[in-house]
Curated annotation (Swiss-Prot):
It comes from Acidovorax sp. (strain JS42). InterPro entries: AAA+_ATPase (IPR003593), ATP-dep_Clp_protease_ClpX (IPR050052), ATPase_AAA_core (IPR003959), Clp_ATPase_C (IPR019489), HslU (IPR004491), P-loop_NTPase (IPR027417). This is ATP-dependent protease ATPase subunit HslU. ATP binds at residues 18, 60-65, 259, 324, 396. Belongs to the ClpX chaperone family. HslU subfamily. It comes from the Bacteria. SUPFAM superfamilies: P-loop containing nucleoside triphosphate hydrolases. The gene is hslU. It is found in: Cytoplasm. GO terms for cellular component: HslUV protease complex.
Length: 446
């Protein structure tokens, strides 16, 4: 898992997310504590449980983006789920245990990919040998030497010449016929909600039936090389060891991000749909507190999985969550609404800002977009004003406004090839001011 310091994590998040320093610090400390726990003596390590985080803030201020960026930094099994997808056991919908099953799937995939990278050099050598065996069939009686030295006796010079050409890509377009494992047919089974695990087991059982079949395929060497490397790497990876390590990784380092947690908060004691909402909260309790979940790879304990929940809490309040669940999220972080200055920073300072994205897109058509500082300031003001007068959707408003602003340029890009379009305050006002001031229009268009 990642050994980045809290300062390094916050610095990396700053490249993509403006403001929200409290939330960044909280997730940075939580991520660093995962690493610290691994350094503690084994006798005490089991007693140290993660401090779960609840992020509270309006939509579009960076809650989900923090989760997305954290997934890349964590170098640990990470899954993001929507609380609204789950229902109480017995109702139509997914049960919360599937969160852990999905996390384990991520861990297995992550571990397998890491192991395949380690054996890639050996797999590439084996794939090269198989291709060379087709191009220069080994002489009879050379089998012993081939197994011992990797080069057929009496044929090493020609083989080395072809190996050099193969590595330099000179033979990529040559077509050869090779034997490849025929992928077992996938049995598609439609499963009722809540029975995904049983369906997966049935699918796995059917796919294992019968022996592995091989068939000859005609392919270009470049494509054959990719397929052979994958096949050889799969042979070198110990699947049982992968599963064992993946289970341990999910248990010790797993991170679950639960978005839209406010949507399962009940505002009052009521029947109907709220029964299912409270049921989801009750089902989440043992998962967050620590329980054992059965997966197809084995049993998984959730005691040391870190849970980060987030919600806008427009209609409900954090206190509307059942008290037991509130207690399972001891760290609470409030994210603030975005100001005009924040909008400007989002447009100019982030690593992959909307300005850079649109410039890169239109550059493919030969159109140069030049945003002046005044144009960006005016754009930020309009996005902020529309948010204030209509629904506040945070930074997502910038995407809507930018799309409307550059609608004509995007449409006529082929005709404008070779030209420079200057986006200044006048350009922005001409295309957006009337819309932003008309509340009825801005409600539907911006």
């Amino acid at each position: 898992m990642s050994s980045m310091t809290p300062q390094e994590i916050v610095s990396e998040l700053d490249r993509h997310i403006v403001g929200q320093n409290g939330a960044k610090r909280a997730v940075a400390i939580a991520l660093r504590n995962r690493w610290r726990r691994q350094q503690v003596d084994a006798s005490l390590r089991h007693e140290i449980t993660p401090k779960n985080i609840l992020m509270i803030g309006p939509t579009g201020v960076g809650k989900t983006e923090i989760a997305r960026r954290l997934a890349r930094l964590a170098d640990a099994p990470f899954i993001k789920v929507e609380a609204t997808k789950f229902t109480e056991v017995g109702y139509v919908g997914k049960d919360v245990d599937s969160i852990v099953r999905d996390l384990v799937e991520v861990a297995v995939k992550q571990t397998r990919e890491a192991d395949m990278k380690k054996v890639r050099v050996r797999a590439e050598d084996a794939a090269e040998d198989r291709i060379l065996d087709v191009l220069i069939p080994p002489a009879r009686g050379a089998g012993v030497d081939t197994a011992r030295t990797g080069e057929p006796a009496g044929d090493s010079t020609a083989r080395q010449v072809f190996r050099k050409k193969l590595r330099e890509g000179q033979l990529d377009d040559k077509e050869i016929e090779i034997d490849l494992a025929d992928a077992r047919p996938q049995f598609e089974i439609m499963s009722p909600a809540g029975m995904e695990e049983m369906t997966e087991q049935l699918r796995g059982m059917f796919s294992q039936m019968g022996q592995e079949r091989r068939r000859a395929r005609k392919l270009k060497i470049a494509e054959a090389m990719k397929l052979l490397v994958e096949e050889e790497a799969a042979k070198l990876v110990n699947e049982e060891e992968v599963k064992t390590r993946a289970l341990a990784n999910a248990e010790q380092n797993g991170i679950v991000f639960i978005d839209e947690i406010d949507k399962v908060a009940s505002r009052q004691e009521a029947g109907g749909a709220d029964v299912s909402r409270q049921g989801v909260q009750r089902d989440l309790l043992p998962l967050v507190e620590g329980t054992t979940v059965s997966t197809k790879y084995g049993m998984v304990k959730t005691d040391h999985i870190l849970f980060i929940a987030s919600g806008a809490f427009h209609l409900a309040k954090p206190s509307d969550l059942i008290p037991e669940l509130q207690g399972r999220f001891p760290i609470r972080v409030e994210l603030t609404s975005l100001s005009v200055q924040d909008f400007e920073a989002i447009l100019t300072q982030t690593h992959a800002s909307l300005v850079k994205q649109y410039q890169a897109l239109l550059e493919t058509e030969g159109v140069t977009l030049d945003f002046t500082p005044e144009g960006i300031t005016r754009l930020a003001h309009i996005a902020f004003e529309v948010n204030e007068r209509t629904e506040n959707i945070g930074a997502r408003r910038l995407s809507t406004v930018m799309e409307r602003l550059l609608d004509e340029v995007s449409y006529d890009a082929t005709r404008l090839s070779g030209q420079t379009v200057v986006v200044d305050a006048g350009y922005v006002n001409a295309r957006l001011q009337s819309l932003s001031q008309d509340e009825d229009l801005s409600r539907y268009i911006l």
